[in-house]
């Protein structure tokens, strides 16, 4: 029988100083975790107050510890600070959405979009096209329902050559970020139009933030200090479960 002193075991993948003991006294109960998940709501109204850098870094710390396929840790972050800078992304989002829905006005355009998106994707966008154009019109008239006059936008990006799980990795990081934001007193909302507008708007948003051409935006969160606090959370649909 061998007896080793404490800390004698080492691993080439984990150099000294890269493994931290778990602080069990900080671990929440199941009920506490579930209450955080239940009470997290999308926030769409933000105070005119910037989010401090140290607070943003706490959100990113939670995001970077999200699980990832093969533990590749592929997700990278672009932090857009300040209402003016976020508004510029909103303007590019509006242009990208307009460019995407424009073909649906014409038969030949609808045919081309079916070839690009597939029938189901094109039908879905065609159904939403009037609403999306309405959001663009509102934005151009001064009512921002795209990025909600938020003081902060975080883009979750990765090298697209990594495969389809780059999107999964990024959105696992998004979920961690939303929960951390909630715990820090921030409000957040998933900004799906930003990715859609970038994909179908010629990649203008990616170019605007100097994203490498090999990379893609897989997730986007607008964030800030909320103007309103919800005191209750609504029920969700029951889980559809098949037990095997």
Can you say where each PLM-predicted feature lies in the sequence?
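Acidic, surface-exposed loops and disordered segments
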Residues: 1-244
């Amino acid at each position: 029988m061998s007896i080793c002193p404490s800390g004698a075991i080492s691993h080439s993948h984990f150099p000294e100083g890269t493994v931290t003991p778990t602080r069990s006294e900080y671990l929440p109960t199941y009920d506490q975790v579930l209450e955080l998940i239940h009470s997290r709501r999308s926030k769409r109204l933000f105070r005119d107050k910037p989010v401090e850098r140290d607070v943003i870094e706490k959100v990113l710390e939670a995001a970077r510890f999200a699980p990832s396929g093969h533990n590749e840790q592929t997700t990278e972050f672009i932090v857009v600070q300040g209402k003016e800078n976020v508004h510029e992304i909103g303007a590019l989002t509006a242009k990208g959405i307009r460019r995407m829905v424009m073909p649906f006005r014409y038969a030949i355009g609808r045919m081309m979009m079916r070839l690009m998106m597939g029938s189901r994707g094109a039908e879905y966008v065609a159904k939403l096209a009037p609403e999306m154009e309405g959001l663009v019109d509102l934005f151009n008239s001064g009512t921002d329902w795209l990025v909600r006059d938020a003081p902060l936008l975080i883009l979750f990006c990765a090298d697209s050559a990594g495969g389809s799980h780059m999107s999964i990795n990024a959105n696992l990081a998004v979920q961690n970020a939303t929960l951390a934001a909630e715990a820090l007193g921030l409000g957040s909302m998933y900004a799906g139009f930003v990715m859609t507008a970038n994909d179908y708007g010629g990649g203008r948003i990616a170019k605007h933030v100097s994203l490498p051409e090999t990379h893609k935006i897989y997730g986007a969160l607008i964030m800030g200090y909320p103007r309103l606090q919800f005191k209750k959370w609504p029920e969700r649909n029951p889980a559809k479960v098949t037990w095997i």
